[in-house]
A protein has these predicted regions:
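Cap/insert and terminal regions of metallo-dependent hydrolase folds
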Residues: 4, 20, 45, 51-54, ...
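Metal-dependent catalytic neighborhoods of phosphoester/phosphodiester hydrolases
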Residues: 32-41, 183-192, 217-218
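Residue-level marker for buried hydrophobic side chains located in beta-strands
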Residues: 114-116
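A general structural signal for stabilizing positions within well-ordered secondary structure
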Residues: 9-13, 57, 76, 96, ...
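Metallo-beta-lactamase
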Residues: 48-112, 193-213, 217-220
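A short C-terminal boundary segment appended to hydrolase-like catalytic domains
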Residues: 218-230
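Pre-active-site segment of Zn-dependent metallo-hydrolases
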Residues: 1-26, 33-37, 48-51, 92, ...
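Structured loop/turn residues at beta-strand edges in well-structured enzyme cores
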Residues: 13-16, 41, 64, 80, ...
Length: 230
């Protein structure tokens, strides 16, 4: 199995109470059985794309705690609206079983509107989402583990920044770059390229340390912490 760059900042047991969990797709680095079963026992609600409900039910999650949605469908809990939106990726727990949907998500609350890309290559879906459902206070966008040969399923860093612009996001948080090594680039190349592209295109980049708590309502200042990693 692929190893993490470093141990998790917090254990599952140290996390605060979690009410809702969105799942982008069923690849192993995005859908972990042990984590699902931990939150199953906490009665968390899972929001998943089509086909993934069967995984969760097999792992013992009650049907009442699963909301399965197609692209552009939404569901509301306690004033928080969750929208399942398109992504450009693929799925499957094995190399041949690709019968489940992949997705990005919007979490729209009275306090903020957040976009989460899941895994995705760059395409016109970002512009469509921005036009129909934007703007966003912050966008978490796939910015790592890319390669020119598979750019259709993982954004290049420059494309990720352009995606944030297409989405009409006020701020972008690069994700999918500092946990697992799944490509051939240096571990910090994604953030360096994202930083340069953001400066050139005028996008505000948020680069918190792993585990750092961020208040989106504040003007946050972030160090280039990756430059200090040996």
């Amino acid at each position: 199995m692929v190893q993490r760059f470093q141990p998790a900042t917090l254990s599952l047991e140290e996390l605060p109470p979690i009410d809702y969990i969105v799942i982008s797709h069923d690849h192993y680095d995005h859908l972990d059985m042990r984590s699902v079963q931990f939150f199953r026992d906490k009665e968390a609600t899972f929001l998943v794309p089509l086909g993934i409900k069967s995984h969760l039910e097999y792992w013992g999650v009650a049907s009442k705690n699963i909301v399965e949605l197609d692209w552009w469908a939404d569901h509301e809990f306690e004033g928080i609206r969750f929208v399942c939106t398109p992504a450009q990726h693929f799925s499957g727990r094995t190399g041949t079983n690709q019968t489940t949907l992949w997705a990005s998500w919007i979490v729209d609350s009275p306090n903020s509107k957040i976009y989460f890309s899941g895994d995705s290559g760059y395409d016109e879906h970002y512009q469509k989402i921005g036009d129909q459902l934007g703007p966003f206070d912050a966008a978490f966008i796939d910015s790592g583990q890319y390669n020119e040969r598979w750019r259709e399923v993982h954004n290049l860093p420059e494309e990720a920044v352009q995606a944030a612009i297409d989405l009409r996001a006020k701020q972008m948080i690069p994700i999918h770059w500092a946990m697992f090594e799944l490509s051939l680039h240096d571990w910090d190349e994604p953030i360096k390229r994202s930083q340069q592209a953001a400066e050139e295109l005028g996008m505000e980049l948020m680069t918190p340390k792993l585990g750092q708590v961020v208040d989106l309502s504040l003007k946050n200042q972030f160090s280039h912490w990756w430059e200090q990693v040996q």
